[in-house]
């Protein structure tokens, strides 16, 4: 039987692998305007050690009138490489809600051919509740090479729905 949880990792697993050279961590937090929260500012103030911030409001298809549409592959590739993510890295994504925008970014990685990507079970709220380490340190990441290719078979358009 296939492991149905292969796309989710526990907080204890991530804590054990924080220093692993092939692990990259991304905070993909995003909030609805009525929530009056600033995801990037919250990241700057407190995040999982080694994490980078992915801004879904900036890395999108700017030609579309709809919010958060998939960015062109070149934009996604460039943005992810600047976060220090390259071929051979396992990416762990979390958000400040638990599992809302993290699932969206997980899907974006899959669309662009990056399959070694997982979501942190319970996200940052669970990490905090368990008193795991946090930091305000912002580390510059070395730009890496990342091979991307689009897999539109997992994208639905209006006709598909």
Could you describe each region identified by the protein language model?
Residues 1-161:
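Cytosolic catalytic domains that perform sulfur/thiol-centered chemistry
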